[in-house]
Amino acid sequence: AFSGILAEADIAAALKACAAADTFNYKAFFAKVGLSAKSADDIKKAFFVIDQDKSGFIEEDELKLFLQVFSAGARALTDAETKAFLKAGDSDGDGAIGVDEFAVLVKA
């Protein structure tokens, strides 16, 4: 799903680092997976991969399954992780993360 954007080895390392419940940290994850160093264009491409229903927003249910977009065998985020992730990214308070909000979150 992220071929041409992210390296498989970086994805594996990032997923391994947050394999235990309640250890997910979006800043650490985006840095480890290599996304925070990418161009605005690549970050936008990643957003559209994560936006599974193609609504133009990443909603709470998509955030919960965020890690599984990177690898099917990855765990779901806990409710606490999901809510913290949404709160960090949803700067306008509409309950979802838009493409511009996502870009800010990745670079945070």
Curated annotation (Swiss-Prot):
Stored SUPFAM superfamilies: EF-hand
Keywords: Acetylation, Allergen, Calcium, Metal-binding, Muscle protein, Repeat
Any GO molecular function: calcium ion binding
Residues recorded with modification N-acetylalanine: A1
Binding-site residues, Ca(2+) 1: D51, D53, S55, F57, E59, E62
PANTHER family hit by this protein: PARVALBUMIN, PARVALBUMIN ALPHA
Function: In muscle, parvalbumin is thought to be involved in relaxation after contraction. It binds two calcium ions.
Miscellaneous notes: Is regarded as an important allergen. On the 2D-gel the determined pI of this protein is: 4.29, its MW is: 11.50 kDa.
Stated name of the protein: Parvalbumin beta 2
Biological classification of the source: Eukaryota, Metazoa, Chordata, Craniata, Vertebrata
